[in-house]
Amino acid sequence: MEFMKSLSGHDALLRIRLGPVRAYVVCEPGLVQQMLREPAVFDKGGMLFDKARQIVANGLATSAWTEHQRQRPLVQPAFTRARLEAYAPVMAQETDALIDTWQSERPVDIVEQMVTLFARITARTLFGSDLDRASIATLQQALPVVVEGVYRQMTAPLRMWEKLPTAANRKYHRAAADLHAVIDQFIDELEGVQGDRPDGEDMLSALLEAREGQDRLSGAEVHEQIFTFLMAGIETTANAMSWTLHLLARHPEVQERLHSEITDALAGQVPTLKDLSRLEYTRGVLTEAMRLYPPVWLLTRATTADTSLGQWRIPAGSAVAFSPYMLHHDARLFPDPERFDPDRWCPPRGDKASQRGLFPFGGGARKCIGDVFSLTEALVALVAISTRWRLTPGPGPDPRPVAKLTLAPDRVIAVAHPRPSPRDGHGSGRR
């Protein structure tokens, strides 16, 4: 990550070597926006995405532009505002259930807890309330292994690497089989009762509805989209929240201001989407954490035709990349870029111009389809945690960013201190 940060402030376009591939790195947000506005020319492809498709198939995150154009309108109904309104209470319930287990003045493994939380939220919003705890436990155990295995195979110099009978490969293949089995089992169960079941508010119901009509998702495509949501939806939000809670523990003045805004606005009530839109400082805290530690730290494209970015000509078949992490640490875009400053995003300082270099979920027509869902679940969780607990740094060193598929902290340990309940004035944590 220090290498990416060192590129901040350089010329608009650089040529570097990424492993065996020579790539253009875009360092200027205006050129990044141009690239994202031309998804047919700057398509998902090249060595990494070609490998990814062989591993995780052809979901929205990896599909070529022509296929993405067909799939996205069919998947979009799973992420409507009405469905988000229905998901919010589930997000709050799962967060409360998790933080009920925290103990006063005891260390909390934040990374492990956030993975657990967002695995449960994703499982319930994806599959509905019928998903049993054993299946959720399988998802929690299998997903980190699969994510690690996918990254290892995508970056392996030789295709045969994944065929070697190593312990890591055997563990990956077992975890992937478990994950696919859970997905298939629940699709089969839901299809079997769909005619006798009221319209579901879960994502899988929306995807199964997308199998109706002339242009529809096939059964294999429904499976691929669910696999993609699980791969992308849990780790990214868990990492974003882990970094956010780490920063809050290290900045008590920010944490107290956040708590005051939440208490004044909600008084302990579960927030609606409208409530969340009014929590300006709370949203600023999360946005600033994702500026410093964007869940997606590197995005790559492959040119499908001869083209240009600004004054630079780029031949067809070229690898083109940009790093949200690099742009987010560019002092030309964000003065004093290493400072954790949520007020960057709040009135009177926050405006559209300040967001032109912000890319935590990519951008353009291929921006993450679940960005609003991810922000909503993170905000709901942040509200619930900040209402009931105050965090201070735990023992050990500060976390170190680890760049894999996402930008993960190697560890975050915080000590939890109960806060008085806004409703009754009593401590809300277990003692």
Please report, for each region that a protein language model flagged, where it lies by residue.
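Conserved cytochrome P450 K-helix E-x-x-R motif and the immediately C-terminal K′/meander segment
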Residues: 1-11, 181, 269-310, 331
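Cytochrome P450 catalytic-domain helical core, especially the substrate-recognition surface
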Residues: 1-5, 17-22, 29-34, 39, ...
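Conserved cytochrome P450 catalytic core segment spanning the I/J/K helices
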Residues: 2, 12, 53, 80, ...
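Conserved cytochrome P450 K-helix/beta-meander segment immediately N-terminal to the heme-binding cysteine loop
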Residues: 41, 322-350
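Conserved, non-catalytic sequence blocks in retroelement Pol enzymes and Pol-derived host proteins
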Residues: 84, 193-196, 273-280, 368-370, ...
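Cytochrome P450 catalytic-core helices
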Residues: 236-261, 371-389
